[in-house]
Design a protein with these regions (language model features):
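N-terminal beta1-alpha1 ligand-phosphate binding loop
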Residues: 1-22
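A general structural signal for well-ordered alpha-helical segments in protein cores
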Residues: 7, 11, 49, 77, ...
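Active-site-adjacent alpha-helix of alpha/beta-hydrolase-fold enzymes
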Residues: 13-20, 114-122
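Short beta-strand elements in bilobed, periplasmic/extracellular small-molecule ligand-binding domains
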Residues: 22-31, 35, 122-131
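N-terminal beta-loop-helix "entrance" segment that forms/cooperates
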Residues: 29-45, 137-140
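Helix-loop-strand module that forms the ligand-binding subsite of alpha/beta enzymes
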Residues: 44-119
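Glycine-rich phosphate/pyrophosphate-binding loop and the adjoining helix
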Residues: 121-164
Length: 164
């Protein structure tokens, strides 16, 4: 994820606003996940894939915040999701999608299709789109803006209720 990513800032703001007991721990190593290859689907996958699957396995849910590239899902995210397809840790996993731009409709639609195919539980009340593109890209500023922080809290509280 880019250092100045608005989606990264949104996740950091969400982490600071999360309800008691909710920990948001971004996985920032997607770029290290090798290209998916079914031939490498063995009991001992590459170490970073094992780490990724392990993090997903111990989590109660998955919160995805991603940009839209060429009207779709960024390759690194799609690749990481591909590594979860045959894994027992993902089916039924509750997923919320956060979007830092109102222009992210295509990535949302593509992600929904992918995640539904993977048997995720999409948590509709926890879905969030904020018009952050071209505004505050700093997590502190996002969290300090009542219009944004209230919406983030509402989405996270809905997610927490679903996970409870």
């Amino acid at each position: 994820m880019r250092a100045a990513s608005t989606n990264k800032a949104l996740l950091a703001a969400a982490a600071s606003l999360a309800p008691a007991g909710m920990i948001i721990d971004p996985f920032d190593r997607l770029a290290e996940v090798p290209p998916f290859n079914p031939d490498h689907e063995t009991p001992t996958p590459p170490a970073i894939v094992a780490l990724w699957r392990g993090e997903i396995g111990i989590s109660d849910g998955l919160l995805i915040s991603t940009p839209e590239y060429a009207r779709g899902v960024p390759g690194s995210l799609k690749n990481a999701l591909d590594w979860l397809v045959s894994s027992e840790v993902f089916p039924g996993k509750p997923v919320a999608l956060f979007q830092a731009s109102e222009r992210g409709g295509a990535v949302q639609a593509a992600l929904r299709l992918i995640l539904e195919t993977m048997s995720a539980k999409l948590v509709e009340p926890a879905m969030l789109t904020l018009p952050l593109l071209g505004t505050q890209t700093d997590a502190v500023a996002i969290a300090a803006n009542p219009a944004h922080s209230n919406k983030i809290r509402e989405a996270l509280e809905a997610y927490a209720r679903f996970l409870a």
